[in-house]
Amino acid sequence: MSEIAQDSNVSIFSKNEKKARELILKLGLKPIQGVSRVTFKKKDGQIFAIDRPEVYKSQGGNFVVFGEAKVDDFTQRLAKAQESLQQNEGVLPAGQDAVSKDPQSIQADMQAAADSATDKPSADDAVDDAEVDETGLNADDIELVMQQAGVPRAKAAKALKEHDSDIVNAIMALSG
């Protein structure tokens, strides 16, 4: 018997799995090609992901998905994305010069920014001092937003409240 190469994409099915697949085809389910990932989100926000799933569609429009479901670790994926952004931060897009303004306009912009910063505190700074109601928010979510956006707890809680506890949108709003 010949060996299967380690990097090949071969699936070996048990006898019971072969029977189940034959029954699925007899039910009229059609295989859907080209699906690389399927995710499911539960009510409590937990996300399950199936990489390289086998997807079938019924005549009624329902889908049947086979594959190994894993809990999707969003924080790990977010950290990887931020790491890649930081690595590419110093790289300018092709065709863009490092200096897009003349020196006088840059100095004028810097002076205007310095003047506005010393004149009055921003509205966001007032949020830092005030206590924000954290009821209905998950403490882990607040900590994650604080860590990823680099903001104080009050700002993180306020952003989560404004975005209905959506971590991604809260981080994007604070980072932008």
From Swiss-Prot:
Record's Gene3D superfamilies?
Answer: DNA helicase RuvA subunit, C-terminal domain (1.10.8.10), Nascent polypeptide-associated complex domain (2.20.70.30)
Q: Which residues form the signal peptide?
A: none
Which family, according to UniProt? Answer: Belongs to the NAC-alpha family.
* Single GO biological process annotation from the record: protein transport
Q: Which GO terms describe its cellular component?
A: nascent polypeptide-associated complex; nucleus
Q: What does this protein do?
A: Component of the nascent polypeptide-associated complex (NAC), a dynamic component of the ribosomal exit tunnel, protecting the emerging polypeptides from interaction with other cytoplasmic proteins to ensure appropriate nascent protein targeting. The NAC complex also promotes mitochondrial protein import by enhancing productive ribosome interactions with the outer mitochondrial membrane and blocks the inappropriate interaction of ribosomes translating non-secretory nascent polypeptides with translocation sites in the membrane of the endoplasmic reticulum.
InterPro entries hit by this protein? EGD2/NACA0like, NAC-like_UBA, NAC_A/B_dom_sf, Nas_poly-pep-assoc_cplx_dom
Which keywords has UniProt assigned to this entry? Cytoplasm, Nucleus, Protein transport, Transport
* Residue ranges of every copy of the NAC-A/B domain listed in the record: 14-78
Is the Nucleus keyword given for this protein? yes
Protein name according to UniProt:
Nascent polypeptide-associated complex subunit alpha
Q: Where do the UBA domain residues begin and end?
A: 137-176
Chain residue ranges for the region called Disordered = 85-127
Q: Which residues cross the membrane?
A: none
Subunit comment? Part of the nascent polypeptide-associated complex (NAC), consisting of EGD2 and EGD1. NAC associates with ribosomes via EGD1.
User: Could you tell me which Pfam families the record lists for this protein?
Assistant: NAC (PF01849), UBA_HYPK (PF19026)
Where in or outside the cell?
Cytoplasm; Nucleus
- What coarse category fits the chief subcellular location reported for this protein? cytoplasm
